[in-house]
Structures are given as C-alpha cells and as structure tokens.
Regions:
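Conserved acidic catalytic loop of the alpha/beta-hydrolase fold
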Residues: 86-104
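N-terminal cap/lid segment of alpha/beta-hydrolase-fold proteins
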Residues: 2-22
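Conserved HGGG/HGGXW glycine-rich cap/lid loop of the alpha/beta-hydrolase fold
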Residues: 17-75
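Short glycine-enriched nucleophile-adjacent loop
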Residues: 113-124
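Catalytic nucleophile-loop/oxyanion-hole region of alpha/beta-hydrolase
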Residues: 74-88, 141-149
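A catalytic-pocket lid/entrance helix-loop region that shapes and gates access to the active site
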Residues: 127-158
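Conserved alpha/beta-hydrolase "nucleophile elbow" surrounding the catalytic nucleophile
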Residues: 108-110
Length: 161
C-alpha cells in the first residue's frame, strides 16, 4: 500500500449547495500530482483517509467525496433528488470546482466501481485511466447475488470452522 504513511488530507470542504445537497470532498497526496477521482462504495458509504492507501500519494492527487446523503455530505432530505445520474454529475461538478481540466484516473470499488464506469461513459473526454476493484455492475443478476446468493459464502465458511 503506497499511501499508508502519507495519507494526510491537504484540502477539504464542501461543493456549493445544489439541489438541496452540499457535497463533502477532500484531497490527499501531491497537490501537483496526477489527479485521481475516487468513488467510495455503498450506497451509503463514505470516503475515508484509509482509501488513500490504494494510491501512490507522492505522485498522485487523490480527490474523494461523500456522495449525496452519505458521510459528511449535508442535506435535509437524503432521498430527494438523489439518483445515480446526479451522483455522476456531482463528480463532474467537483472536478470543475477544483479547476481540474485534464483527464483523470477514475477509481472505485463495489458501488464506487459502478459510479466510476458511469462517469467514464458520461464524460469520456475526462478519462485518462480506470482502476476498479470489487466490481459491482448493479445488473439484475448482481442484485440477486448480493441479496440472496452471497449468503452461501457464510454457510460454506461456517461448515469449515
């Protein structure tokens, strides 16, 4: 893990309120480094300083944000005007707010991998690279596995203890 000893946040704040949501963001790593836009898992998760451990913080500028209704982002109504398209647009608004014009690496895991792929599809001109882990595509079969079949892992594991 590259960032383990150097995952200090150098900038944090909120995007200006839009549609009743204030989006929390933070940046870590090299302020002049290659920009990486990180999408956390969930839905309902949040960005954590430990997510910096996935990156080379001496060379990369890692931008993280708490999605609408998550973590330190603020809203009166976490459901209203909170959908996948808006989450992707919020990510683009964040890059604009931070004056990041060059293509970025998008990264994410689980639900974050879904959002990273949707971001790349919506804004292909903004993409330098895509880095995904624990990929979740939010297809019907993925939902069925998550809600029903994933329990098989626990049953199998318990049988071997």
């Amino acid at each position: 893990m590259f960032g383990f000893f150097n995952n200090k946040v150098f900038d944090k704040g909120y995007l200006p309120e839009f549609e009743g949501h204030e989006i929390y963001y933070q940046q870590m790593g090299n302020p002049k480094g290659e920009p990486v836009l990180f999408f956390h898992g969930g839905p309902g998760g949040s960005c954590k300083d430990s997510h910096g451990n996935y990156f080379n913080l001496k060379k990369q500028r890692v931008i993280m944000f708490d999605q609408r209704g998550c973590g330190r982002s603020k809203t009166e109504d976490i459901i209203s005007l909170n959908d996948t398209k808006r989450l992707v647009k919020d990510a683009n608004r964040l890059l604009e707010y931070l004056n990041i014009c060059e293509p970025v690496t998008v990264a994410g895991g689980s639900w974050g991998s879904t959002l990273a792929l949707l971001f790349a599809e919506k804004y292909p001109e903004r993409i330098a690279r895509i880095c995904l882990y624990a990929v979740f595509l939010a297809r019907r079969e993925d939902m069925e596995w998550m809600l029903r079949d994933s329990g098989l892992f626990y049953q199998i594991g318990r049988a071997h203890v």
